[in-house]
Structures are given as structure tokens and as C-alpha cells.
């Protein structure tokens, strides 16, 4: 009797403990706030540094109201350092990366061509792009432009916060149909969508309840285990199954015919890729400069990339190195950029670039220059992971500037030796 009493108390204590754990879990879940993170940081450093280089990005507006249009423009360079682990962008799609449908994408243009579908871009070429958006859902949203590459997935570019004011209920997305009528596709056909979802949910629930009320999983397992698998489904149940299949087929066929009759003029979803996208001329690697990467190191504790170059100025004006751009980050030489640059702060190191010789490279002159790129953003944006890549290589674009205002972007890439001890 004492054993029984202790067993009962143990069971009651276990139940109470389980109840306390469940209540504590519920309380912690109630205290959870919305998630807020930059997902591009999770991508490998080599993927972001050696695939694409985004520059001259501009967000036309960062404060808009619902239904207001805004755009993202810029230039996209397909790096020659493209890694072998990822298929080259023979099939890719320019899109935006944003937390849900906070804005509607009205159009995308690459190389001056409207590109609503996938396209082919060439390695070593630079393309101008424009993405037109329409504010939809109020909030404070982080918006990227990104290129989705077959087998490589989405490769996001720099992001900017967009503040959308107003009421979501005021949003409209009017489209003119082939018959000349204009509809708001935000709400068009919503009643039919809800109706058909409800019909099939009810049908599915009825189907599940019918079979579960018969025997359930455990009962059917017992029948199979006892050697009665052939008797598990009765003739009546076979008839019910056949009639259910027939009813589903009839509903689909009949209402499909009704829909085709009501909407005779339709266009199928479009397929196919765009080719021969016009690339920009006189952009990356087109300047009067010969640049050779000699060697380099990456100091992990100091978040510092040190790269040595041999640079020859083949032009008629002196040139200065003003910027290093990689993975959306911009490291600036403060002696060249003397005023504030309009760019997202978390991606801008306005004093992140320094040179062993900051004097201009004269026409016809060859210089050995050590370029130091140092900033905490190497770590906060998780680019320090290049020290752990299988080939430990960096890539980016160096921007050279002349007194007349000319700018010459040049791709640089090469292996670096990681240093893990402070020097």
C-alpha cells in the first residue's frame, strides 16, 4: 500500500512538473519579439566577394507612403574571380530581397532592357540596372537588390532601410486586362480563392475523419500484424473511395470548363530567358592602368587586409587610389573622399583604406603600393571568414581617381595568408 501511495505521489509530481515546464515555455514564447537580422551575413565570404560587385547604388527614396513608387539603380559587375564552385550566371534573375511583400516589384531593367524573367549575364562585364518598386505594407523594412543565380541561389547586394507610412488597406495594384477592364489584383478573385480553399479543406477533413473513425492507425496496425491485411479495407470502403475520386475529378473538370468559358482570353505564364543583355563600356578594367597583385595577408585579430600591388599609370593624368569595394562594403581613402558619402552606414568604412604611399601615381610611373583595408566591418559583416576558405582568396574593385574627375574601377583578386596572432 505504501508503494502504491508513493507511486501515485510520483505520478502527481511528474504531472505538476510537466505543467510547470509547459507554463514556463508558454511565458518565454510570449516574450519573444520579432526577428531582425541581415541574412546575407550567413553566406560564405568567398561567395559575396568573388561573384558580384555592386557599385553606384542609389535608392531614390527612403521615406515613402503606401502606393508611392521608388526605385533602386546602380551597376553590377560580374567578377572575373567567379568561384568554380558556383555555376556562372548563364541563367539568373534580378530581384529584391525584402522581408515579405512589403513592396510590389513593378519592373526590372538590366542593360536598358525590360527583364521580367531570367537572363544570361557574362563574366567580366558590367551592367546597369533599375528596379521599380511600389510601397505596399507600412513599416521599417530592410531592402536589398539581389541576383539569383542557378545552382548558386540569391546573392544579395547592399541593403537600405525603407520607411513606409500610411494604411495597408489603402494599397491598390491596378492592372488593365486584355478585355479593357481595370482590376485591383491585390483583391481580384479573392472570394473565389477563399471559397475553393474552404471546399477542399472541408473535403480533406471529411476524408480523414471517415478513415480515422473506422480503426485509426493503431487499429489498422493490429490488423496487419495479425495477418488480416487483406481484410483491412471492406468492399463498402472501396466504393466510398471510388466515389470520392470520381467526385473530385468531376468537380475539377466541370469548374475548369466553366472558368475557361468565363475567361476565354488568357496568357500562360511566360518562360524563356533573355540573351544579349547590353553591357556598359568603359567601366571595370577599362582604365589606363596596369595592376599586378604581388601578395597579401589578412590579420584576423586586427580585421585588416594588407595587399601589395605593382601599379603602372599608362594614362595622361596622375591617379590616386580612393576606394576598395567588396561584397557591398565600401572602404574609403579619407584623403580622396573629403565629404560625406550617401551610403548605408553599416556598409561604409569612410576611413577604412590607407596606402603605404598616398601620393598620386604620375603618368608613366610604376609604383609598389601596399593597400591596407582595416575596419571592424570585416568582422561584423563576417567577411573575416575568408581566412577559413579552402583557398583563402579575396576579391574586389579598386577605384582610381584623376584630378579631372575621371574614375577607373579595376578588379583585384588573389590569395592571402591568414594571420591569427596579433603582430
What positions do the PLM features span?
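Short beta-strand and strand-turn-strand segments in soluble, beta-rich domains
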Residues: 53-54, 99-116, 338-355
Amino acid at each position: 500500500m505504501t508503494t502504491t501511495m508513493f507511486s501515485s505521489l510520483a505520478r502527481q509530481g511528474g504531472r505538476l512538473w510537466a505543467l510547470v515546464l509547459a507554463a514556463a515555455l508558454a511565458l518565454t514564447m510570449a516574450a519573444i519579439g520579432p526577428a531582425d537580422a541581415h541574412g546575407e551575413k550567413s553566406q560564405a565570404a568567398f561567395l559575396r566577394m568573388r561573384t558580384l560587385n555592386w557599385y553606384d547604388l542609389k535608392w531614390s527614396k527612403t521615406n515613402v507612403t503606401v502606393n508611392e513608387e521608388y526605385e533602386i539603380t546602380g551597376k553590377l559587375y560580374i567578377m572575373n574571380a567567379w568561384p568554380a564552385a558556383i555555376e556562372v550566371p548563364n541563367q539568373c534573375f534580378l530581384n529584391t530581397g525584402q522581408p515579405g511583400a512589403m513592396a510590389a516589384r513593378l519592373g526590372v531593367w538590366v542593360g536598358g532592357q525590360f527583364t521580367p524573367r531570367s537572363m544570361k549575364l557574362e563574366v567580366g562585364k558590367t551592367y546597369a540596372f533599375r528596379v521599380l518598386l511600389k510601397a505596399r505594407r507600412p513599416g521599417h523594412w530592410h531592402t536589398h537588390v539581389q541576383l539569383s543565380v542557378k545552382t548558386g541561389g540569391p546573392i544579395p547586394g547592399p541593403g537600405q532601410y525603407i520607411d513606409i507610412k500610411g494604411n495597408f488597406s489603402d494599397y491598390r495594384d491596378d492592372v488593365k486586362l486584355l478585355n479593357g477592364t481595370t482590376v485591383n489584383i491585390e483583391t481580384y478573385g479573392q472570394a473565389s480563392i477563399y471559397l475553393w480553399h474552404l471546399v477542399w479543406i472541408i473535403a480533406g477533413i471529411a476524408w480523414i475523419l471517415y478513415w480515422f473513425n473506422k480503426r485509426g492507425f493503431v487499429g489498422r496496425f493490429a490488423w496487419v500484424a495479425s495477418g488480416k491485411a487483406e481484410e483491412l479495407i471492406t468492399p463498402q470502403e472501396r466504393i466510398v473511395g471510388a466515389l470520392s475520386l470520381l467526385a473530385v475529378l468531376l468537380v475539377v473538370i466541370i469548374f475548369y470548363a466553366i472558368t475557361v468559358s468565363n475567361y476565354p482570353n488568357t496568357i500562360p505564364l511566360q518562360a524563356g530567358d533573355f540573351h544579349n543583355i547590353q553591357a556598359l563600356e568603359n567601366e571595370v578594367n577599362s582604365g589606363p592602368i596596369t595592376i599586378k597583385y604581388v601578395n597579401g595577408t589578412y590579420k584576423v585579430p586586427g580585421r585588416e587586409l594588407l595587399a601589395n600591388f605593382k601599379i603602372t599609370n599608362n594614362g595622361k593624368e596622375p591617379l590616386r587610389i580612393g576606394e576598395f569595394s567588396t561584397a557591398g562594403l565600401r572602404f574609403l581613402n579619407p584623403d580622396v573622399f573629403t565629404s560625406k558619402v550617401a551610403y548605408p552606414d553599416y556598409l561604409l568604412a569612410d576611413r577604412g583604406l590607407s596606402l603605404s604611399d598616398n601620393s598620386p601615381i604620375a603618368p608613366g610611373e610604376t609604383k609598389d603600393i601596399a593597400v591596407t583595408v582595416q575596419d571592424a566591418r570585416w568582422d561584423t559583416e563576417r567577411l573575416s571568414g575568408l581566412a577559413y576558405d579552402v583557398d583563402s582568396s579575396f576579391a574586389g574593385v579598386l577605384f582610381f581617381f584623376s584630378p579631372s574627375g575621371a574614375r577607373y574601377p579595376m578588379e583585384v583578386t588573389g590569395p592571402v595568408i591568414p594571420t591569427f596572432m596579433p603582430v
